[in-house]
């Protein structure tokens, strides 16, 4: 969890009383060093978007770890501590279809979009998804092998 330098999740909550400045952020730092940001916006009334930004990417890999950051990004969509059936199965069961991740040179970004805020349990569960993505992946060898093949195919298609 030490490699987690920054947690950025932007929640777009719809409230009955509109805020005057929708671009203001609330932010803070937890005891474990995690920084969070919350921003209200009226763009999607009744829905929230969640982001996890980790300041880790391919830059942190040693030569013998080439592509590992990308593999770990893919592994976030397999079993996690709280979602043994996989995060996508949980999200889709609740009608949430927009979620993804990207690994760059110096960061990895995960997101879950358009989450209904009417259910506080679902809101809490999406925060739990971010928590699991931050360091509670179940790294099963067979899943890692499968994702390595997927990544090879992604690279082949880009060329």
Language-model regions, residue ranges each:
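Bacterial Sec-dependent N-terminal signal peptides
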Residues: 1-22
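Mature N-terminal segment immediately following signal peptide/propeptide cleavage
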Residues: 19-51
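Active-site-adjacent, His/Asp/Glu-enriched structural segments that form or flank metal-binding
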Residues: 56-69, 74-159
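Short, solvent-exposed loop/turn segments at the edges of secondary structure
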Residues: 4, 31, 45-47, 94, ...
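Generic marker of residues within folded, mature protein domains
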Residues: 8, 42, 100-102
């Amino acid at each position: 969890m030490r490699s987690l330098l920054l947690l950025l999740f932007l929640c777009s909550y719809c409230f009955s009383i509109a805020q005057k400045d929708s671009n203001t952020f609330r932010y803070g730092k937890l005891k474990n060093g995690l920084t969070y940001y919350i921003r209200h916006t009226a763009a999607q009334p009744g829905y929230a978007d969640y982001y996890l930004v980790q300041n880790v990417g391919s830059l942190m890999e040693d030569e013998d770890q080439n592509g590992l950051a990308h593999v770990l990004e893919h592994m976030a969509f397999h079993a996690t501590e709280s979602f043994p059936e996989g995060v996508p199965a949980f999200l889709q069961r609740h009608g949430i279809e927009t979620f993804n991740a990207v690994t760059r040179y110096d960061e990895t970004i995960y997101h879950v979009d358009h989450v209904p805020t009417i259910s506080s349990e679902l809101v809490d569960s999406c925060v739990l998804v971010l928590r699991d993505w931050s360091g509670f992946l179940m790294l099963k060898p067979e899943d890692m092998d499968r994702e390595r093949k997927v990544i090879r195919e992604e690279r082949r298609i880009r060329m």
